[in-house]
Amino acid sequence: MPSNSRKLHWEEVYQTKPLETVGWYQPKPETSLSLISRLELSFDAAIIDVGGGDSLLTDHLLNLGFKDLSVLDISGAALRRAKTRLGIRSGEVHWLESDILDFEPVRSYELWHDRATFHFLTHPAQIKKYLEIARKAIPHDGFLILGAFSDKGPPTCSGLPVQRYSILELQRVLAPHFDLIHGLNLDHITPSGSVQAYTFGLFQ
């Protein structure tokens, strides 16, 4: 799917579906917060949430005391929703409206977090470009947290095909650039009650 088509798709999603109804909704992103906690990052650490949209991860990280947060999303509507929800605290966050494949990092991030953006990249050239961008943005002592549908997960998400990964497959794809520190599988229960099987990896 071309970049402009991807943008139109996600703008429609965020303009028509309330946060609490989308399949990826989490009132508290427990897995991401647990993985971040084990890193013992400084509160001044630069963290970027790729494809973060209006996820509540940013709210929780702000509440924990993190001061250098960036949220990147292809959808301006998603970012506006997040800003509205955060109110005055939205000024504490760097908001980046961009397709991840068009993103040109101008700084480095000690943590790159991505829950369910990477798995929408289904062509080798897209995956290669994503990893090149991430490698440019993450210093050698930095970390990457990646969540994607597992090999037991559904073949589509929000009406789009996804690339599913076991822990070993995710490790293999990222191996040229990153080393796996910890991997896990888990089930996410959507607001409608369906189960989505995820693979998460913590890399450096």
Go through each PLM region and give its residues.
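Short catalytic micro-motifs in class I SAM-dependent methyltransferases
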Residues: A116-F120
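Class I (Rossmann-like) S-adenosyl-L-methionine-dependent methyltransferase catalytic domain
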Residues: M1-R107, L121-A137, G142-Q204
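A conserved beta-strand element that flanks and buttresses the S-adenosyl-L-methionine
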Residues: H113
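Conserved acidic residues
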Residues: E110
